[in-house]
């Protein structure tokens, strides 16, 4: 039984539902189409592809795997910057960080760079009721303290009331006292309000789906989940899925000899947690004691399984409301998270573990046949059920794709006009896209054909970047403010290699100097899939790299 709602939650829901009624009237006038597809966009925080559907044999994610079994799954999707606010603003506007000019958390793109349209704004302008639940935009300055309202949303976004406790002392330690720890399995009945943010977000999203079921207008619902973002604050029973004796270390837990210091992420954010501080770990390289490394990995995987239950409840409700046959579902993450690879933890780098993300699209009638009357595509699956079978993805693409392609792809799948490609420069253009339209991947001749889509992946490139304040790791290397950025690491990922150059950067002019090379990295994927052996030769310079930039 769900915990009783707070007065604040009931007030918000009442305001929202009354706003929906008002929005329905105005949006129906804008779009009288009754058969337009709805959109459910699920955005997860810090989720690398540690999922059964991506081949992870340890992680229990039956509900996300079930979604993938009816979907098109992209095996090689990459974020454009491995930190929350810049990545979210990038893919929600369809522009790269060098266009949004957001590399930190401290500016609002509409004021700082250009009045760029967003995905929900575009759907709203095309007759959709647009709704935000949980962490969609990063809260704060980077979304104008409003989650980009009123531009993007038909009414004010919802944030769970228990969100405010995420970084407070709610983790009960072995001493019986409460701490602000990294590892924070909890008894849900023992935490403030008797609930957790992602549980509240699921409940509110389901209530909105119930309201929209009878709507004459299509809806665009974005649901942002917090876990597995730190702190790892999740119901403690999920630890049982991952006994410590079954948890291995990262396959490459040492800092590679050839790694340039500028490329290293010193994981300062997790060092601030009380349980990590107690370990007295040296800065910047550590390492973290082996037994604690296992505990971090255990809690990350447990957080993923907890997240999976919330996704499962949301999709099961979509099914129960008979909306699965009229709703596109897109599932992704803002970036990945290192779990000890290269001696690193968290995001904040250009490595695959930080930039590689899940990207899954369910399109009714395209990626899967329409469900028969009474058929459930997404029945809730319990991750504690050991009898559950691993489900293979319905369709897969090995092509390299970027999160910046989410905007044109969702627009095209919904039958809206795909925004045009951006000119260079595009700061004056409100509606355009810098990502590719991925619609070609959804043109299936026969759902029974080879589930691996053909193509020439060597023609494709994914771009990422990360700023640094210094050539050597320091206290603000992970999250430098714009004024402190001295170096930008531009990274190209192809099917064959990852190539990164770290070049001088002028934060006042937002200008990279490719003749001022500080360091470089080159990893060949076939022979070095973990990216541990840097083959970069300083004589290669930045000329070739600059030619390959978008």
Swiss-Prot record:
Effect of residue 225 to D: In MPS2; intermediate form
Catalytic activity: Hydrolysis of the 2-sulfate groups of the L-iduronate 2-sulfate units of dermatan sulfate, heparan sulfate and heparin
Phenotype for residue 340 to D: In MPS2; mild form
Full protein name: Iduronate 2-sulfatase
Gene that specifies this protein: IDS
Glycosylation sites: 115, 144, 246, 280, 325, 513, 537
Essential cofactor(s): Ca(2+)
Known outcome of mutating residue 48 to P: In MPS2; mild form
Source organism (scientific name): Homo sapiens
Resulting phenotype, residue 138 to D: In MPS2; mild/intermediate form
Annotated phenotype, changing residue 491 to F: In MPS2; mild form
Outcome (variant: residue 135 to N): In MPS2; intermediate form
Domain of life (superkingdom): Eukaryota
């Amino acid at each position: 039984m769900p915990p009783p709602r707070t007065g604040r939650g009931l007030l918000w829901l009442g305001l929202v539902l009354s706003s929906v009624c008002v929005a329905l009237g105005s949006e129906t006038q804008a779009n009288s189409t009754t058969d337009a597809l709805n959109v459910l966009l699920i955005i997860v925080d810090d989720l690398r592809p540690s999922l059964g559907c991506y081949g992870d044999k340890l992680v229990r994610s039956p509900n996300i795997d079930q979604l993938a079994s009816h979907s098109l799954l992209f095996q090689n999707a990459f974020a454009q910057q491995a930190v929350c606010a810049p990545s979210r603003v990038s893919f929600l506007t369809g522009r790269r960080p060098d266009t949004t000019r957001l590399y930190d958390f401290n500016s609002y793109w509409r004021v700082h760079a250009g009045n760029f349209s967003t995905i929900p704004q575009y759907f709203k302008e095309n007759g959709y009721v647009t709704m935000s639940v949980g962490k969609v935009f990063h809260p704060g300055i980077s979304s104008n303290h409003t989650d980009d309202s009123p531009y993007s949303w038909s009414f004010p976004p919802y944030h769970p009331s228990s969100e405010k406790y995420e970084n407070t002392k709610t983790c009960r330690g072995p001493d019986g006292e409460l701490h602000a720890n990294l590892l924070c399995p909890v008894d849900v009945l023992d935490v403030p309000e008797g609930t957790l943010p992602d549980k509240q977000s699921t409940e509110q999203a389901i209530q909105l789906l119930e309201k929209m079921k009878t709507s004459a207008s299509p809806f665009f619902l974005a649901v942002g989940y917090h876990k597995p973002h730190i702190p790892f604050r999740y119901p403690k029973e999920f630890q049982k899925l991952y006994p410590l004796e079954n948890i291995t270390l990262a396959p490459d837990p040492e800092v590679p000899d050839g790694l340039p210091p500028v490329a290293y992420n010193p994981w300062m954010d997790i060092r601030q947690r009380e349980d990590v501080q107690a370990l007295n770990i040296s800065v910047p390289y550590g390492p973290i004691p082996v037994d604690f490394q296992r505990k971090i990995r255990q809690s990350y995987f447990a957080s993923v399984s907890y997240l999976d239950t919330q996704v499962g409840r949301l999709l099961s409700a979509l099914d129960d409301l008979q909306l699965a046959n009229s709703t596109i579902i897109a599932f992704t993450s803002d970036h990945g998270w290192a779990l000890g690879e290269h001696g690193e933890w968290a995001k904040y780098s250009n490595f695959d573990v930080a930039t590689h993300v899940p990207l899954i699209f369910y399109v009714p009638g395209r990626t899967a046949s329409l469900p028969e009357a009474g058929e459930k595509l997404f029945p809730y699956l319990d991750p504690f059920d050991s009898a559950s079978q691993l489900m293979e993805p319905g369709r897969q693409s090995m092509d390299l794709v970027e999160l910046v392609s989410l905007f044109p792809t969702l627009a095209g799948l919904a039958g809206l006009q795909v925004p045009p490609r951006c000119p260079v420069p595009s700061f004056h253009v409100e509606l355009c896209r810098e990502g590719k339209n991925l619609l070609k991947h959804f043109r299936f001749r026969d759902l029974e054909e080879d589930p691996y889509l053909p193509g020439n992946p060597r023609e494709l490139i994914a771009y990422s970047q990360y700023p640094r304040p210094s050539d050597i790791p320091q206290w603000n290397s992970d999250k430098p403010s714009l004024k402190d950025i001295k170096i930008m690491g531009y990274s190209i990922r192809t099917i064959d290699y990852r190539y990164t150059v770290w070049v001088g950067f002028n934060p006042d002019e937002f200008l990279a100097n490719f003749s001022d090379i500080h360091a470089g990295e080159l990893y060949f994927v076939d022979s070095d899939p973990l990216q541990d052996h840097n083959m970069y030769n300083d004589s290669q310079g930045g000329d070739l790299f600059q030619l390959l930039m978008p």
